[in-house]
């Protein structure tokens, strides 16, 4: 019998083992769709980004007008830009839901997969940040100034690092050109990290909602989950195109319709919605260095998840107290996101401080203690 090319060809067999004959737990729910949706987001962003880059000029005098030109004069330029800008929001929605799934179902116990996932999140955040600067509107400029300035809080070398990042003594032309270079490069780094992420995942196989070893009950990825993923693709692309066509500026900042002006500071500098929770944590600490450390800790705390898992059960499916804390954490993050969008005044300052404290308390103290208590309850 002739060998099956799909299984024998050096390249095709890699694709086959990853996407076709991959043994997959039969009971994974729709929460396992977000990995493939993130892949779709990445492909969409790279394609729309390449098309935008062909019409973009990375120069302070021309950047704003080149973006305007793309929207007004390029065939479907407005659509490509709207898809790219809102595609970033969907990228973050998917990655946050993906991380939430990982926390709820104990996927972080696959340590290598989890750690590469956090690196992917950090790279995505860096990509989104440098990308937001490129249209060179007011919020682009001042957002870049405020966030890069945070590095000056690092003792001794901080100011040098900031000036080195800026390529001068303020955010100017050298900053814009290097940010464009980084924004072009980083998505391909994300693509490379994604392959590493998948390699580690396929070493262990997927987790499942019960958190049990599912080797006795696995089915091929294709056609079952390839079809399920396709449904997810259609649903997400429908939502993305709906947003891009009906309300493209819903999630943007009106300040960005004004070209960057170093002499006029916007009344309220704030990042895009997907960074607001971290921005609220940064603002909740009156000390600059303390705020920067809290900001870093808000994301890097995810590295500790495998070490803080004290339960004998992997998932939260049968742990009602941990479930309550998990949803409390989600509500807390939504409060932080809302506070981050508000001005720095009473009562938002105290709400932000309490929400920041609660965020770290739940992750570092309450969840591990609850896990240990639930173990005790299993004995009775």
From Swiss-Prot:
Pfam families: Cytochrom_B_C, Cytochrome_B. Its main location: mitochondrion. It is found in: Mitochondrion inner membrane. Heme b b566 binds at residues 98, 197. One of its GO terms (molecular function) is metal ion binding. GO terms for biological process: mitochondrial electron transport, ubiquinol to cytochrome c. Keywords: Electron transport, Heme, Iron, Membrane, Metal-binding, Mitochondrion, Mitochondrion inner membrane, Respiratory chain, Transmembrane, Transmembrane helix, Transport, Ubiquinone. CDD domains: cytochrome_b_C (cd00290), Cytochrome_b_N (cd00284). Binds 2 heme b groups non-covalently. It is a multi-pass membrane protein. The keyword Secreted does not apply. GO terms for cellular component: mitochondrial inner membrane; respiratory chain complex III. Its cofactor is heme b. Gene3D superfamilies: Cytochrome Bc1 Complex, Chain C. A ubiquinone binds at residue 202. The cytochrome bc1 complex contains 11 subunits: 3 respiratory subunits (MT-CYB, CYC1 and UQCRFS1), 2 core proteins (UQCRC1 and UQCRC2) and 6 low-molecular weight proteins (UQCRH/QCR6, UQCRB/QCR7, UQCRQ/QCR8, UQCR10/QCR9, UQCR11/QCR10 and a cleavage product of UQCRFS1). This cytochrome bc1 complex then forms a dimer. PANTHER family: CYTOCHROME B. Component of the ubiquinol-cytochrome c reductase complex (complex III or cytochrome b-c1 complex) that is part of the mitochondrial respiratory chain. The b-c1 complex mediates electron transfer from ubiquinol to cytochrome c. Contributes to the generation of a proton gradient across the mitochondrial membrane that is then used for ATP synthesis. Belongs to the cytochrome b family. Heme 1 (or BL or b562) is low-potential and absorbs at about 562 nm, and heme 2 (or BH or b566) is high-potential and absorbs at about 566 nm. This is Cytochrome b. It comes from Garrodia nereis. The lineage of its organism: Eukaryota, Metazoa, Chordata, Craniata, Vertebrata.
């Amino acid at each position: 019998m002739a060998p099956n090319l799909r299984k024998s060809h050096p390249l095709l067999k890699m694709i086959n083992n990853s996407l076709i004959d991959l043994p997959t737990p039969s009971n994974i729910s729709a929460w396992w769709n977000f990995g493939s949706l993130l892949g779709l987001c990445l492909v969409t962003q790279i394609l729309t980004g390449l098309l935008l880059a062909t019409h973009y000029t990375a120069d302070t005098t021309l950047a704003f007008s080149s973006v305007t030109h793309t929207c007004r004069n390029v065939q479907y330029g407005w659509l490509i830009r709207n898809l790219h800008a809102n595609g970033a929001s969907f990228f973050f929605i998917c990655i946050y839901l993906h991380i939430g799934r990982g926390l709820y179902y104990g996927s972080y116990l696959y340590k290598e997969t989890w750690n590469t996932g956090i690196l992917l999140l950090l790279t995505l955040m860096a990509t989104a940040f440098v990308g937001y600067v490129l249209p060179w509107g007011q919020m682009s400029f001042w957002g870049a100034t405020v966030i890069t300035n945070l590095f000056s809080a690092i003792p001794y070398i901080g100011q040098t690092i900031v000036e080195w990042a800026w390529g001068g003594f303020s955010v100017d032309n050298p900053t814009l050109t290097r940010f464009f270079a980084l924004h072009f490069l980083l998505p391909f780094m994300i693509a490379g990290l994604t392959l590493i992420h998948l390699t580690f995942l396929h070493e262990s196989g997927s987790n499942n909602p019960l958190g049990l070893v599912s080797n006795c009950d696995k089915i091929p990825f294709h056609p079952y989950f390839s079809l399920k993923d396709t449904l997810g693709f259609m649903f997400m692309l429908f939502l993305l195109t709906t947003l891009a066509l009906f309300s493209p500026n819903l999630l943007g900042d009106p300040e960005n319709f004004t070209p960057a002006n170093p002499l006029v500071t916007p009344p309220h500098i704030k990042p895009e919605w997907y960074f607001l929770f971290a921005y609220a944590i940064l603002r909740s600490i009156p000390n600059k260095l303390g705020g920067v450390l809290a900001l870093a800790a808000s994301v890097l705390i995810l590295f500790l998840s495998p070490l803080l898992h004290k339960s004998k059960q992997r998932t939260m499916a049968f742990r009602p107290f941990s479930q309550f804390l998990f949803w409390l954490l989600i509500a807390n993050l939504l409060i932080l996101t809302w506070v981050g969008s508000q001005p720095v005044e009473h009562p938002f300052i105290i709400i932000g401080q309490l929400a920041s404290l609660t965020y770290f308390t739940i992750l570092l103290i309450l969840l591990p203690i609850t896990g240990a208590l639930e173990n005790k309850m299993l004995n009775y």
